[in-house]
């Protein structure tokens, strides 16, 4: 099992329950630093996380995962000043809006790919990094499509394809960065939304 003791973790998150609950677990793993990058600040959640492990340093940055690549590079240069290095990158930003296909694809797929492309050089052993782990959070709908969430499903299929490509042993042998996907099941909020959309469609 991957030992997180003393590690520096960067979590690109949305504002949902999965991100908060995952962060709570991370805070029990003796990590040294946790950077949380998401669109909205939540001081109460940060305080709750800090209470779990006061010795872990938590940093928060407001982050737009859809920003241009060049802007993203400058952004992470500032993040690295505080983090020094990144051992684990978690890409958890997600959006489900069938009425806004561009935003859904840009958040779930393009933004995630740009984030990986921006952070990977900081982790790459050939470029002075220490290697590590990238976790791309996707969905079971990326494995088995949903008839009422076509754009969301397509974006999550893309995440799995991108992740499987980067997870090839050839890459790991050169950069020391393992890549994996976590396919989350339905949450109550998502199920309620899917049922409502299905009934409206019917």
Curated annotation (Swiss-Prot):
Keyword Transit peptide: no
Chain sites annotated for binding substrate: 139
Active-site residue numbers: 152 (proton acceptor)
UniProt keywords, alphabetically: Oxidoreductase
Cysteines joined through disulfide linkages: none
Key word Translocase present: no
Pfam annotation, one family: adh_short
Top-rank taxon: Eukaryota
A GO molecular function held by the record: oxidoreductase activity
Binding residues for NAD(+): 11-34
Any one of the GO CC terms: cytoplasm
Family that this chain belongs to: Belongs to the short-chain dehydrogenases/reductases (SDR) family.
Name of this chain's protein: Alcohol dehydrogenase-related 31 kDa protein
Biological source species: Drosophila erecta (Fruit fly)
Encoding gene per record: Adhr
